[in-house]
Amino acid sequence: MTRRNKAQRNLKTDARMTPYDVKVKGTFAEPPKKEKLPPRKPTSEEQRANNLAPVEFSRESASVGNWIPLFRKELAEMNSGKVGRPYSFCDSMIIWIISLQTLIKGTYRTAAGLAAAILEDHGMKAPSYSRLFERSAEMLDRMLSENGGTYIIRAGSNIIDSPRNVGIDSSGFNLSNTCLWRKEKWGTGPKRRGWLKLHVLSDVDTGEVIAFAVTDKNTGDSPLMIPLLDAAVAAGHRIGIVYADGAYSSAENFDHVCGRLGTRFVTSFKVNTKPVNGGSRYRGEATRLWCSMPYAEWVEKSGYGRRWKSECGFSDVKRLFGESIHAFTMKGAVRKLLMKTETFSRYKEQRAILLSGCLASS
């Protein structure tokens, strides 16, 4: 490109500038640079809860004496008034067995053998491998039918009286059985089978999972925000401030959070965002604040720095239960990711209880 063409291009770019692009100093506004802020270290109470949570969660999961009364009560309710052969296994028993499988990173056959050894010692019949597989598949089909077969949305039962400040984010889980050594030595690896996407609405204070959705990799982030919030509210959760990254900064999400739910929505924007409404007056107020100050100052004033907790959840679930999903069929992969998330949700609930105890004793 010649010097003359460059000058003409710069002139056209300046001509497209609007009055909103001019700062108080009288110069053209530069996009707010997203500075890298220093990482926040966990407090002593949080570190203690992090250390105790795996021990207490494993103990609670393996303590079958706490689960047997629940199994018997649910079986009695299922068989009440039933004509014909009575039920032998309740849904909570199937979920408990698959949770053990997720916890030990085993197979269905391993979980069936472990359940047989535990339940038969307490006078209860354990499901076989084939029955365990069939019942888990039936539960997945039931969840898929609730949303038209496109995705799964689940809301947590960890309801409290006070509003929760929540963050939303998504991450992918690998469906390929990758082998890094084969790639390192021979320069080849298995064919990619794709990804599953997990969308999580979590409590930024405790890390608990409030609601989550499982979709394919092509599903966008922004369209899942409203269904996740609606699922959480329908389950009885009270929503406080909602934190999200720039992928969720649509006018529809602003109208839903600020208008319908009546709460604050804190999200970032693209660096070239202009302070205009863009279809929502709530979004216009947020963009004007975004463009009026440097990034570090905006983070401090808006409270956006709390959003990082929603990303930590994905790091935790992949570290505890693995990032890859080993299954032959897509339904099997969805079922395994679903149980990973359900088990992780119970783990975070246990951590929240420990954290509240640590804070109370300090």
Predicted regions and their residues:
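Short Lys/Arg-rich cationic patches that frequently serve as NLS/NoLS or arginine-rich RNA/DNA-binding motifs
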Residues: 1-20, 28-44, 306
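Polybasic low-complexity intrinsically disordered regions
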Residues: 2, 86, 95, 100-103, ...
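Helix-centered, glycine/charged polyanion-binding patches within enzymatic domains
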Residues: 3-4, 37-40, 246-318
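Basic, short loop/linker segments at the boundary and entry of helix-turn-helix/winged-helix-like folds
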Residues: 51-103
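Amphipathic, well-packed alpha-helical segments that form the structural scaffold of globular domains
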Residues: 69-76, 112, 116, 314, ...
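Short, positively charged, Gly/Tyr-enriched micro-motifs
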Residues: 81-151
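Acidic/histidine-rich catalytic cores and adjacent linkers
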Residues: 100, 126, 247-258, 264, ...
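Basic, amphipathic alpha-helical segments enriched in Lys/Arg and hydrophobic/aromatic residues
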Residues: 298-362
